[in-house]
Amino acid sequence: MAKKNLKKTKSKIVSAAWKLFYEQGYEDTTVEEIIEESGTSKGSFYHYFEGKDALLGSLAYMMDEKYEELEPTIADDADSYEVLLYLNRELLTMIEETINMELLTRLYSTQLTTHGDRPLLDHGRTYYKLLRKIITRGQEQGTLRADMRVNELVRYYAMCERALLYEWCLRKGEYSLSEEAECKFPMMIASMKTKN
């Protein structure tokens, strides 16, 4: 029970921070405002985060929360390829509507230069676990190719998804991310399907 409350506290801080970052911008948001918005304490904040900059890496875990929300909506017998498209569409819509593009750009740049934690590559995240589960099921169903290992296909999917996000950041959000993904992502991951 205590572990669940700790996770809930951290989640409240992360959600409040990203809400404020989106509304006010990263630079104009203070730690004090995050604490107030989250309804937590200064001690709780600094228990989880060294400072505001540490919250940039939490975006990956915010994405995981979206996957945790979506997972129960996926039928066990659903076509795995279609499920992958669904997850991508839902995630990128959430990012486009709630994540400040400047912050996403900052996250990607810090992931490229950091020597510490790189949450986008953490295979213990819900993101990677769910992808492994879906791709394994797809191989068992015969809808996703079985001549490649599950982890290779997971890596490929993640690489394609990051490509869409990175390109959107490079172009400074000049187009709809979700519409671009709707058009391009099926082509990008079509090679994961079983060849007929």
Q: Which residues does each PLM region occupy?
A:
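Alpha-helical DNA-contacting segments of helix-turn-helix folds
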Residues: F49, L56-M63
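Basic, helix-initiating cap at the start of DNA-binding domains
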Residues: M1-Q24, D28-T40, A54
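Amphipathic alpha-helical packing segments from all-alpha helical-bundle domains
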Residues: E68, H115-T143, N151-R155, M159, ...
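Amphipathic alpha-helical segments used for helix-helix packing
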Residues: I95-H115, Y166, L170
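Short coil/turn segments at alpha/beta junctions that flank glycine-rich nucleotide-binding fingerprints
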Residues: E23-E27, D77, T98, Q141
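Short hydrophobic/aromatic patch on the recognition helix
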Residues: G39-F49
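Hydrophobic alpha-helical connector segments
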Residues: S58, P72-T98, V150, V154-Y157
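Amphipathic C-terminal alpha-helical segment
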Residues: T93-E97, Y128, K133, R137, ...
